[in-house]
């Protein structure tokens, strides 16, 4: 088994969401077996709203990104989580 790089888009609840605090909260809930790859990047969406792009390295096993998706979705200030890309490395 190898590893998978997964890029996730995290949408905050509103333009008023504290993105600095949200980034820290996301880093604190990364599940065991997943590692943050690089920084959490802000991506402008529209009208001042910014998404957060998180790249994780996870094990290549069934359910790969699901624990991270579920953990991120439970963080206060997160509207939704979407997997943008996933590929073996």
Swiss-Prot record:
Q: Lineage of the native species? A: Archaea, Methanobacteriati, Methanobacteriota, Stenosarchaea group, Methanomicrobia
Which keywords belong to this entry? Elongation factor, Protein biosynthesis
Q: Does the keyword Protein biosynthesis apply?
A: yes
Among its keywords, does the record have Repressor? no
What HAMAP family would the database entry show?
EF1_beta
Summarizing the function annotation, the protein's role is: Promotes the exchange of GDP for GTP in EF-1-alpha/GDP, thus allowing the regeneration of EF-1-alpha/GTP that could then be used to form the ternary complex EF-1-alpha/GTP/AAtRNA.
- Report the InterPro entries cross-referenced here: eEF-1beta-like_sf, EF1B_bsu/dsu_GNE, Transl_elong_EF1B/ribsomal_bS6, Transl_elong_EF1B_B_arc
Q: Which family does it belong to?
A: Belongs to the EF-1-beta/EF-1-delta family.
| Pfam families for the chain | EF1_GNE
Report what the protein is called. Elongation factor 1-beta
Domain of life assignment: Archaea
- MF GO annotations: translation elongation factor activity
Gene of origin?
Answer: ef1b
């Amino acid at each position: 088994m190898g590893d998978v790089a997964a890029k996730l888009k995290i949408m905050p609840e509103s333009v008023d969401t504290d993105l600095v605090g949200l980034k820290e909260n996301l880093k604190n809930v990364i599940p065991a077996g997943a590692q943050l790859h690089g920084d959490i990047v802000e991506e402008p969406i529209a009208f001042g709203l910014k998404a957060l792009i998180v790249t994780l390295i996870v094990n290549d096993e069934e359910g790969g990104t699901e624990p991270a998706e579920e953990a991120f979705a439970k963080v206060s200030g997160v509207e939704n989580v979407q997997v943008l890309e996933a590929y073996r490395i």
